[in-house]
Every structure is written in structure tokens, then in C-alpha cells.
Amino acid sequence: MACARPLISVYSEKGESSGKNVTLPAVFKAPIRPDIVNFVHTNLRKNNRQPYAVSELAGHQTSAESWGTGRAVARIPRVRGGGTHRSGQGAFGNMCRGGRMFAPTKTWRRWHRRVNTTQKRYAICSALAASALPALVMSKGHRIEEVPELPLVVEDKVEGYKKTKEAVLLLKKLKAWNDIKKVYASQRMRAGKGKMRNRRRIQRRGPCIIYNEDNGIIKAFRNIPGITLLNVSKLNILKLAPGGHVGRFCIWTESAFRKLDELYGTWRKAASLKSNYNLPMHKMLNTDLSRILKSPEIQRALRAPRKKIHRRVLKKNPLKNLRIMLKLNPYAKTMRRNTILRQARNHKIRMDKAAAALEAKSDQKGVQGKKPVVGNKEKKAVGDKKLKKPVVGKKAAGTKKPAAEKKPTEKKPTSEEKKAAA
């Protein structure tokens, strides 16, 4: 399949090249912006909505009044009267059976959206540019494997077709009938409540036929399922990008294809059929980044690449790792050895001094036969008891004063002795 050529072949009604060529319009090289297409499609689709609302009286067509507090029931308004189950039931509230909904819908909602004209034209240009790329068209599910060329252009004789069988034969000759068979196979019943709202059956989209003049082409193609017919002067983004997704399979008539440059212009010339409109330009004129980066102008400003690879090595502490310290300071090994020898020499000197001092002390006391014990205290003799030191501020237990002698108490004379004495 040929695509994006500067010259596009025009095919006859027999499905063969007629020998005529058409220059590819500049609009097919416009930037493809799916975000703009989706935004415009979403807003324009809202303009087809029909206002709806619930009745203003719904849920309030009863007499109800709150019972107030003190009855151990909710303070919601309750239906008055008696003699029926309805009396005493809650009313009016959105939480009540038979009550109104929360925030009842109104017909004065902002249903429609205004979209900038230039933005709508940008979206159409993007949709047309995407329709010329086989990858995008096939990603939408269109069966174009056997189509000879994209964009597909046919002679203007097709605009004079009045019979559906002529249109079917043309699609079969152009190898586009596989896309119609896909539509037939996709016809099914809608899931959900749309079945009750005149949207019972659904199907996939087929080719979009774009013409310049209607000489009967609408009647010829309109009864084929999936077909959409558009006038080139009234292109619709809702038809060119159904669902807001670019990549619709389009079949053009020759006169409609030639008119695109007049409608949308080129980058050298403004559009003649639209006032003061210029074709949108790419933000990046050359998308070949490797070619741009390797160009001599950019390479001249860049520094030479660093080809040496510096791998990150685990950093070790030289104060704990002798091997790393020796790499930094080879004299560290000699220093460490000298330190060890100096410590050993100092230790030996201290031990000799301690032994000499102990021996001199034992000689002064006249203790014979005892060898000086180096580094340990003398052991106590077995059986020697440690004398207790006198406690300061308290009298010792052995130095108690003897108790004073008590005088003999004189016996008092009894009453009988007193009588006898008298």
C-alpha cells in the first residue's frame, strides 16, 4: 500500500488507476494533535443534547408537616391524617420514599459549549492528516489491508451514482468491501437502557465518503451500513473522528480532493475560501532527532564525549583498613611497627622499676626469704583476723563504765509493828 506520496493516483470505477495524478494537499501534512481533537469533539458533541428536568411538583404533592421534637422520631415532615398506611410516613425529603430528589434537575442548565473557530479548524486538519496514515487508520479497526492507496481518491463520475448496487460494486472493486463486512458482523443489540430509548441497535463505523457535489451519490451510498457521507465544504469533526479518536477511513472524489488547498491553504499561501486562515504549522519542522544532533552545527558546539567509564568503587575507611591506608601513606606500616616496639619497651621499663621498688621495700623491713611479688598484693596469713577500727563518735563496746551500786532500801514499819512499839 502506497501512502504519503507527493502525487496521489486517481482510481476509476473499475478499481484501476486512471492514469491521472493529484498533488497531495498540504492539509495532510498538518500536525496531528489528538488532545485538540478530543477536546473539540467532546465540546461539540454536547451541543446535540436535549434539555431535560424532573417536574417541579414531584415529591411535594402531599400535605405533610413535622411532628417536632419530643416524640422519639425523626423531625422529617410526615403525612397528616389517619386511616391509611400513608399517614405518618416521612415525606418531601430526598431520603424518604415518595419524596423529591436531591437538587432537582432544571432545564436552564448550561447545555451548550462554544468552541473557537480556529480550534475547530485545527481539529479538522489533524483528523484529515491522520486519515492518510495507514497505521492510525488500521488501529481504529478499519479493514484496509487490500486497499491500493491511502488517501484513496476516485473519479468524479462516482458523484453521479444513483443506485446502491453501483456503490456496492465500486467498494468491491476498490477492495474496501471488507470494511463493510466488518460493519455487518458487528451489528448487535445495545446493552443497557438505551434499548428503550430508540437506540436499540449498534454497529461499527465504515468508510467516510467525501464528495464535492451531490448528483445522486447520497442516495447511492446512504443505505449501506456504516457509510458516512460528507460534503468537502462542510466537514464535521464528529464524523471525521468518531469518539474523539483520529484515523477514519476516507474515500475522496477527485474534485473534493483538489478543493482542500483552497479550503485550508498551504504554508506558503493562505486559504482562499476562509477569511484570514493559515494552515497550522509543526512545532518541530524536522523530527529526525538523530540527524539534528549529528549535524555539524550542533556537533561543533558540543564537547567531545567522555569515553572512559568511571565505575563507582566502594569507599573504605583507611583508619580501619590497613591496606587502604598503605595506598594513601606507605610509611604508615613503619609508623605502626615503631609504635608497637615503643609500647613494648616502655612496658618493660615500667615492670623493671616496679620490681626494683618492691625489692628495696622488703629489704628495709628486714623480711628474709620473701621474694618480691610483682604486680600482685601480698596475701594475708591464714588465721589472722582483721582488727576493727574504732568507730568515731561512738563508744567502744569494751569500755563501758560499771553501773553504780544501789543503796539498800529501808523497810517501812507495818501497822502491827507500830502498835507494838506504842
Curated annotation (Swiss-Prot):
Sequence position, cross-link Glycyl lysine isopeptide (Lys-Gly) (interchain with G-Cter in SUMO1): K361
A molecular function GO annotation: RNA binding
Modified residues (Citrulline): R300
Recorded GO CC terms: cytosolic large ribosomal subunit
Modification Omega-N-methylarginine, positions: R97
Post-translational modification: Citrullinated by PADI4.
Protein name, entry field: Large ribosomal subunit protein uL4
Gene designation per UniProt: RPL4
